[in-house]
Amino acid sequence: MAKQSMKAREVKRIKLAKKFYSRREHLKSIISDLSVLEQDRWKAVLKLQTFPRDSSPIRQRNRCSQTGRPHAFLRKFGLSRIKVREAAMRGEIPGLKKSSW
C-alpha cells in the first residue's frame, strides 16, 4: 500500500492540472506560434514558468486504484499487475483467464 500522503499528492496534481489547463494551453500556443513577436513569446515563456510545477499533466503518475502502487500499472484495468492477477484468479474480470499452452 502506498502512503496516504502519496495518494493525496496525486489528487492534488490532478486538481492543479485541471485548474491551469486552459491557461497553459493558451500560453503554449503563443510560444509555438512563430508569427507572434519574439518578445511576446518570451513573455509567455516567463509567465508559464511562474505556474506551479504540479500543474503540468506530465507530472501525474498512474496509480493502482486499490493499493496506490505506482509501478506495473495496467491502464485497461486501472490496477497494478498484482491486483489484476488476484482478481483474475477469483474470476472477477469477465473474459480474462489464465493462459495455458
From Swiss-Prot:
<comment type="subunit">
    <text>Part of the 30S ribosomal subunit. Contacts proteins S3 and S10.</text>
</comment>
<dbReference type="InterPro" id="IPR001209">
    <property type="entry name" value="Ribosomal_uS14"/>
</dbReference>
<keyword id="KW-0689">Ribosomal protein</keyword>
<comment type="function">
    <text>Binds 16S rRNA, required for the assembly of 30S particles and may also be responsible for determining the conformation of the 16S rRNA at the A site.</text>
</comment>
<dbReference type="Pfam" id="PF00253">
    <property type="entry name" value="Ribosomal_S14"/>
</dbReference>
<comment type="similarity">
    <text>Belongs to the universal ribosomal protein uS14 family.</text>
</comment>
<keyword id="KW-0694">RNA-binding</keyword>
<protein>
    <recommendedName>
        <fullName>Small ribosomal subunit protein uS14</fullName>
    </recommendedName>
</protein>
<dbReference type="GO" id="GO:0003735">
    <property type="term" value="F:structural constituent of ribosome"/>
</dbReference>
<dbReference type="InterPro" id="IPR023036">
    <property type="entry name" value="Ribosomal_uS14_bac/plastid"/>
</dbReference>
<dbReference type="InterPro" id="IPR018271">
    <property type="entry name" value="Ribosomal_uS14_CS"/>
</dbReference>
<dbReference type="GO" id="GO:0006412">
    <property type="term" value="P:translation"/>
</dbReference>
<keyword id="KW-0699">rRNA-binding</keyword>
<dbReference type="GO" id="GO:0015935">
    <property type="term" value="C:small ribosomal subunit"/>
</dbReference>
<dbReference type="GO" id="GO:0005737">
    <property type="term" value="C:cytoplasm"/>
</dbReference>
<dbReference type="GO" id="GO:0019843">
    <property type="term" value="F:rRNA binding"/>
</dbReference>
<keyword id="KW-0687">Ribonucleoprotein</keyword>
